[in-house]
Amino acid sequence: PMEIAFATENIVNTLGEVLAKANLKQLRIAETEKYAHVTYFFNGGHETKSIGEDHVLVPSPAVSSYDQKPEMSAFEVTKKIVDAVSGDKYDFILVNFANPDMVGHTGNFKAIIKAIEAVDSCIDKIVNSVLLRDGLVLITADHGNAEQKYNMQTGQIDKEHTTNPVPFILIGKEYAGRNIGWPTIAGGDLSII
């Protein structure tokens, strides 16, 4: 048997659990490449769904490399989100667009631009749909990738994740025209926001 250096961390009171305890309905949606991120990982490494938590998996395209189809399944994911928003069934919808990361890993700059343009178009549709219902949209990321494709030190194409700052954008009618700049969040603690 293999010895393990660190015990498995039991993550409790995830956002999903907090929403479920508050009897709020949740939708988690992504295409194949990021499905585990909106389900298993978002649930603290647990497979079990909470009460009121629905999952939607949209198949990723069957291509050998995502630079061949940089839009991936973003438009299909977006249609399902817009339909869910207009259905007024959910209090919280979590989506992970795979394109910036997965196409970013190809290092194909032209394809990366197309991927970002596709996601930008999709976010516009989602934001408009949510704002029509006086909802809030939060846009963020867990790492960078698409924004830096050239390593200045090596002169090589960079296909890896970056540690660059990521956006934290809150969109809602009550926030129109406000910009809080670049605050530092100590240790990633969002409770102070």
Where do the protein language model's features map onto the residues?
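Feature captures the catalytic ectodomains and active-site-proximal regions of enzymes
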Residues: P1-I193
